[in-house]
UniProtKB/Swiss-Prot annotation:
The enzyme's E.C. designation: 2.5.1.145
Record flagged with keyword Manganese: no
Name the record gives this protein: Phosphatidylglycerol--prolipoprotein diacylglyceryl transferase
Top-tier EC class: transferase
Upper lineage: Bacteria, Pseudomonadati, Pseudomonadota, Betaproteobacteria, Burkholderiales
Residues at which a 1,2-diacyl-sn-glycero-3-phospho-(1'-sn-glycerol) binds: R146
PROSITE patterns in the cross-refs: LGT
Pathway(s) of this molecule: Protein modification; lipoprotein biosynthesis (diacylglyceryl transfer)
Length: 271
């Protein structure tokens, strides 16, 4: 049995300014995205895509800027709407209290979809071409976010078997019984494993929409599995059919990914 180290969430204190580890993981996520997107720009199929114009470093900068806006706004609104709609309907001003925590991946994903639709429209590019470009660069950012969750000792897992070698006690959970370190599970599955699989899959020319479909299915499946080990939000608990809110949100995501991949596979054009 392991004990969570209870790391100070503040990485650096500069007078009244507190720099949190969680904020640094967000910076790491955006930095990794820019690095990986730059690598993608040098390789097929994007190195040879010229219509309606060659891809450039400026494109990546704009994609990242709009993506950050989509993640923050969509993630916050998604949390408020998916997890605590009743509370935020009666306390609407607290939607802006982002320092209190509360972000949703599924909401952030919707925010990114909208922001990249705007980018694609402004560049007169196919929206799916843009999404296929960025999809393999996303999992490392998810991995960085799970590192932040672990450092904060939040989003811990359900109770594990007492003899599980990596079972971990999280002091903030209110119990001294070992739990699954679900943040680590998600780091490995939604972060590293999904990144490797998607990066390798996307290195070969694919029909437009296939990479995006593969991402939706891959993330949805890994998140669905991880939810069996993650402690449900105490204000929601387990919902219909014994599934958590995270799992219910993954169901349409997986279905959409399967549909998109099949639809893209039946297309005659790769772009």
């Amino acid at each position: 049995m392991l004990i969570h180290p209870e790391i100070n969430p503040v990485a650096l204190q500069l007078g009244p300014l507190a720099i949190h580890w969680y904020g640094l993981t967000y910076l790491a996520a955006f930095g990794l995205f820019f690095f990986l997107a730059s690598l993608r720009l040098r390789h097929e199929p994007y190195a040879s895509i010229t219509g309606p114009g060659a891809w450039s470093r400026r494109d990546i900068e704009d994609i990242l800027f709009l993506g950050v806006m989509g993640v923050v706004i969509g993630g916050r609104l998604g949390y408020c709407l998916f997890y605590k709609p009743g509370y935020y309907l009666t306390h609407p001003l607290e939607i802006f209290a982002v320092w209190q925590g509360g972000m949703s991946f599924h909401g952030g994903m919707l925010g990114v979809l909208v922001s990249q639709w705007w980018f694609a429209r402004s560049r007169q590019r196919p929206w799916l071409q843009v999404m296929d470009f960025i999809a393999p660069c996303v999992p490392t950012g998810l991995a960085a976010g799970r590192v932040g969750n672990f450092i904060n000792g939040e989003l811990w897992g359900r109770f594990s078997a007492p003899d599980l070698p990596w079972g971990m006690v999280f002091a903030h959970s209110g119990s001294m019984l070992p739990r699954h370190p679900s943040q680590v599970y998600q780091f490995l599955m939604e972060g590293l494993l999904l990144f490797v699989l998607l990066w390798l899959y996307a290195r070969k020319p694919r029909k437009m929409g296939q990479v995006s479909g593969a991402f939706l299915v891959g993330y949805g499946v890994f998140r669905f599995i991880a939810e069996f080990f993650r402690e449900p939000d105490d204000f929601l608990g387990i919902l219909a059919l014994g599934m958590s809110m995270g799992q219910w949100l993954c169901v349409p995501m997986i279905a959409a990914g399967i549909w998109l991949w099949i639809w893209a596979s039946n297309r005659t054009s790769r772009r």
